[in-house]
Design a protein with these regions (language model features):
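Conserved glycine-rich acetyl-CoA-binding loop
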Residues: 60, 83-97, 104-106, 111, ...
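Extreme N-terminal starter segment of soluble prokaryotic enzymes
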Residues: 2-4
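Acetyl-CoA-dependent GNAT
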Residues: 7-85, 96-98, 102, 135-140, ...
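C-terminal "cap" of GNAT-fold acetyltransferases
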Residues: 8, 109-123, 127-129, 135-153
Length: 153
């Protein structure tokens, strides 16, 4: 395997949408308005400083993850998805790490994640990289029931 991590390229835009749509729908049954808005406004997100990373092997996308600025020096790590049809050991962790580094390199002092407590593999990645669970009064997504942050960047 000759996997490499690359920043957004137009030819992988649909993979970003498809991997995340597949993952969200297979786990929760439907996309939310916030998901659709993110997919429709990729260019606007990137103009605001966001970046989408891909793990790629021989021009095939394996996994993807987005890092986007929120308020002040807080950035969200989101839309971690993968290609179910291709074996990809470590691809999710690799794009997650690249997204964290992008945010840090662009002024993040705090990283933030909204997730769901049933997603054990994703929760493992967050904990592996030092994220700590936090309590929120409300969540941006109906499916969101757990949140994490990391401040020791």
């Amino acid at each position: 395997m000759s996997m490499k991590i690359i920043p957004f390229e137009e030819r992988y835009r649909q993979d970003f949408i498809d991997f995340n749509t597949d993952w969200i729908v297979s786990n929760f049954g439907f996309l939310e308005e916030n998901d659709l808005r993110t997919f429709e406004k990729i260019d606007e997100e990137m103009q605001r400083g966001a970046m989408i990373f891909f793990a790629v092997d021989h021009d095939t996308a394996l996994a993807t993850c987005m890092s986007r600025p929120m308020e002040g020096t807080t950035w969200e790590i989101c839309k971690l998805g993968s290609n179910r049809n291709v074996p990809h050991r470590g691809a999710g962790s690799a794009v997650f790490r690249a997204s964290m580094e992008w945010a840090k390199d662009h002024g993040a002092q705090k990283l933030f994640i909204i997730s769901n407590s049933s997603l054990k593999p994703a929760l493992h990645i967050y904990e592996k990289y030092g994220f700590k669970e936090i309590k929120l009064d409300s969540y941006e997504y109906v499916r969101g029931d757990i949140a994490f942050e990391k401040t020791d960047l």
